[in-house]
């Protein structure tokens, strides 16, 4: 449900996290494309700025409401909504960030619990993600980029690193345009990448946090 995913993104005050936990060395990202790729990065792309009221509104409109008064929202059918979150074990700042994520989500009425109750050692984390562990609903990860921002290597239908396993005809069509000879035209290439960045924001199958 894109409304649920967007709500989870709007609930996070990642700019504050970057300032307080990383001494201002990391900042909130507005796009799945990083500013390093200045030719195609869209600085005007709408991002998920901290907006808990908007997050609550999205959940209300989508039918995720607190029907029993315990402060936590239920599924649309009234059943308990519990979301399992997986995150890597890293440094002390990351541990604090993970706990803050859980708190921010609780503030908008979402019951999000850590998978196994704690963060996961790096290799085990990726083993579970690659194995499509059915108990993991959401995960926090990161990646490095080369010198080509083409998204097919991360989000293509058969991409090895498409850990989100999210594929739909619209996204596939945009990626094909980015990889087409038509994209040799600089203006077209910029247009296609802007389309991709907006698509990722709207679907929110992945949402960027810190860069």
Model-identified regions with their sequence ranges:
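Extracytoplasmic/peripheral linker and loop segments enriched in polar/acidic and small residues
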Residues: 6, 18, 111-124, 152-211
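Ligand-binding clamshell of periplasmic/extracellular solute-binding protein-like
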Residues: 119, 136-151
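Loop/turn elements at helix/coil->beta-strand transitions in domains of secreted/extracellular proteins
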Residues: 1-5, 13-17, 80-82, 107-112, ...
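Append "and occasionally in soluble cytosolic enzymes with long acidic Gly/Pro-rich linkers
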Residues: 1-103, 195
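Short helices/loops that flank or line small-molecule/ion binding pockets
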Residues: 2-3, 99-108, 122-136
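Short, solvent-exposed loop/beta-turn-alpha elements that line the ligand-binding surface or hinge
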Residues: 1, 38-57, 67-81, 127-134, ...
